[in-house]
């Protein structure tokens, strides 16, 4: 095994370098994974360009899959795996009941420790989610956002015959729509201000609204006979869309906050009245469940493998690590349509 590898190493905010770094040193209970595919999450943009990671230098990247090349157990070598990126302490109160996303002292691949914008990564065996060669590495790398979307649908308590409105039609928004269908929703309405995303959503068979041209609240009310959606999921992290979700949901309905805001958000008095008068249920959603009782990663991977959740159309751009400037440029400049942008190691 060589002593160095190529990686995208974040030395400071805005200072992401494609360079040689030491090969990861595998500890007991870890495997060395050759990264074959790693998606760029929307959260990676502020992580790289505005907010930074928890320390420098750090290799970002938390949506990934690869092949095990070293392990304590020789039978694991050669197996394929996606990776749950959260490393819980396994000691706190939340961890004791399997709610690892609520861990009070967690670590995380790609933000608190080195991630997968690299040729190799050392990961805990506990975090591995195995898959066979009927599934591509690219599809398996979509397991992380798929599991996050599945968790949000669970928070929204989507049921058979429901109408679900999703504000934000990016990769997560599309997967929210796919999971809502799987949960039995009879109508899924996606809302976005980007006409290319609206058109893409329509090509996936969704009812989609361009919020710049059509008032999404009025549209949702019209489509539901004035009743409103059973559940609204706000995935943009914007005050305006959150308030639209409050107005578009039915009385006694559920609004789930999912989008990460870029700054403070202000709720108007009218929006607050919507909560009071309609007696709404407000929920947050964070990460995904990864325990013996409810493992959303295994559910997501099985759904992706069967193409019940078909993630293949969502992968719009593929780049080698050496073309990171181009990859991030697609997402930052927004001059062309993109959905999931992914780094591929051949």
How should these model regions be labeled?
Residues 156, 199, 204-280:
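Glycine-rich cofactor phosphate-binding loops and adjacent beta1-alpha1 units
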